[in-house]
Amino acid sequence: MTAILERRESESLWGRFCNWITSTENRLYIGWFGVLMIPTLLTATSVFIIAFIAAPPVDIDGIREPVSGSLLYGNNIISGAIIPTSAAIGLHFYPIWEAASVDEWLYNGGPYELIVLHFLLGVACYMGREWELSFRLGMRPWIAVAYSAPVAAATAVFLIYPIGQGSFSDGMPLGISGTFNFMIVFQAEHNILMHPFHMLGVAGVFGGSLFSAMHGSLVTSSLIRETTENESANEGYRFGQEEETYNIVAAHGYFGRLIFQYASFNNSRSLHFFLAAWPVVGIWFTALGISTMAFNLNGFNFNQSVVDSQGRVINTWADIINRANLGMEVMHERNAHNFPLDLAAVEAPSTNG
């Protein structure tokens, strides 16, 4: 009888824990995805802060030339970064216990792998937590779908690209200047600016900014007057009020006359779907582009595509970009390569004897 009572008490304790985890009454919703999200993001954040401040230089290229990334080793906020794991490690899983010592682990850039893998797990769980909370509240699932765009982009540069290139040393450094270096080298090696999926991503980000500014300014300009000239217009809104706070008919009429009638949405729901979908689809395509270029399916090559009647090349902007790419390629990892890959790939002339 005693054993039965103890088991019921145990089940009751577990039940209370489950109810607390999945309760929508908590100040911050936890959820089952949150059970994994919280420790992974805390780990990634803690190690990032410590490494950004104090990590020793990392042998990123595997040629015994360490690169400094932390503040205590001479960097500032702009130049500092978490240096990617060494090319000597490649794609190997490299936790602390796989190294002979902590010094070796730090020298080979172990913190980068630790941060990136925990971060990707954490943001994926954050996306799942968004879906989970929406489900509990009876909402539609599109918040998590929208968040999948930045998750896909982060996964592309931190995981898919290193897998395709064969080493975590090719992943994006965790810092401002390191990100710029990643972008420059990516252009040099993959001609990303000439990739149509990147172009769609640019249209998504810039177009999303434009549409967001247009929508915000239209709404702000067509607010229903509820205040005097001496009060802030924001005081005319009360949280939870039933009536509209702006005149969508006036906004529609203004924009329809500014451009043309059918350029203006007359349905608030379809308008907001468009505002969400445009940048999300664009960033999806960019992530897809990074993931294809990871395996060297690169941007368009229009080099020397225009010639005159004598066969002489007439340079286009594609040729100017190609010249810039070659310049960037010979300058990066100067001591790791004797020639840029494009030049080194040419077969040597055959010799007799």
From Swiss-Prot:
Cofactor note: The D1/D2 heterodimer binds P680, chlorophylls that are the primary electron donor of PSII, and subsequent electron acceptors. It shares a non-heme iron and each subunit binds pheophytin, quinone, additional chlorophylls, carotenoids and lipids. D1 provides most of the ligands for the Mn4-Ca-O5 cluster of the oxygen-evolving complex (OEC). There is also a Cl(-1) ion associated with D1 and D2, which is required for oxygen evolution. The PSII complex binds additional chlorophylls, carotenoids and specific lipids.
Binding site for pheophytin a: 126
One of the protein's GO biological processes: photosynthetic electron transport in photosystem II
Location within or outside the cell: Plastid, Chloroplast thylakoid membrane
Catalytic reactions of this protein: 2 a plastoquinone + 4 hnu + 2 H2O = 2 a plastoquinol + O2
Family: Belongs to the reaction center PufL/M/PsbA/D family.
UniProt name for this protein: Photosystem II protein D1
Annotated source species: Arabidopsis thaliana (Mouse-ear cress)
Gene assigned in the entry: psbA
